[in-house]
Amino acid sequence: MSTVKRPLFVFAGQSNMEGGAAYPPSEQIRFSDSYEYLHKPRRFGEERGVFKKTAYPAGEFSYEKLEEAYSSLDDFRSLSSLDTFFEHTFFVPALSNLKSEADKSVYPFEGYSEANFVPSPCLPPYLARDWEARGHVCAYAHIAKGAVSIEHYLNPEMLARFDRERASIPGAHDARYRPAMTGAAGAYFDEKTRDFFADSEARFPGDDLSVRALFWLQGESDPNWPQAEYLLALRLFWEQARSLGFTHFFCIRVGNWRDDAIINVIRAQEQFFSETEGAYMLTRVSSYFPMPGRDESGWFIETPPAETQNCRDSWFGFANDHYNQKAFELISARCVPNMERILYENKPPVLEPELLRGLR
């Protein structure tokens, strides 16, 4: 019997990787032989995390202080009602904020907790589904959180290096969330990743787990960074990721979040993922999702293709510009063939033509 190739995937980034659409997923997805990893049992003292074959909920509430979030640490199945999660978590699951479809209203995300949240669609389940449809399997971990800078992922050592090295970059500045940055979230990212890899080795002892890929969709919180500053952060994060055992770094290119200055972040992503060994741009399509209420004639060279329309629930009247299920399914459809090319055919990815005025 041939060895099963089971790459291990980690999905990281901010809200458009986390999943923050208004509409919940249209249906549950049940994988044939792929799994999402949940780390919470480990934090409650269990020997291993758990692997599940259902897509939703996707991700998990990773509270910073367990004793603050839970009345008892005896049972990892207990659910915390601690909300205002941005202040109390390292990472969170995909969150839908639909209040009423009839009047197109949404809830503020801050009111959600582990006990009351509603799942949102997000990229990992659709990518795992499409990966299986092409005859492959995987295991994955969702480690994302909305409204965070790339600095959120740097552990204390890398954060200190970043502060030292960016001091010489013209125009470098403290990011919006910098005052609270300690490296603790980055350290927890390292912890969950290491445990995911170790628990995968225990759960799938006969499988080939040699491919370990980090997927990245982030940048909306860092729009005013100089290209060199974001490029430095990517280089340090990849160094950190390699030390954890990652073999590949995959980018879903960031899009515009109502600030054209993000073009420098996009330039940094293009540069890094074209010149760095083991790092690959999988798709640019996520840069091409129009946003309602904006004059984008100066942003796009030409109108993006029809398939990129209506990829945010704001097009349906909701005050929510996050990517929706259509967007994630389109991103997955673009990523998976390129993943096969890179991982199994030793070929470079085939990317979409450049449609951004500042890059062509």
Residues covered by each model-derived region:
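Cell-envelope and extracellular/periplasmic
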Residues: S2-R360
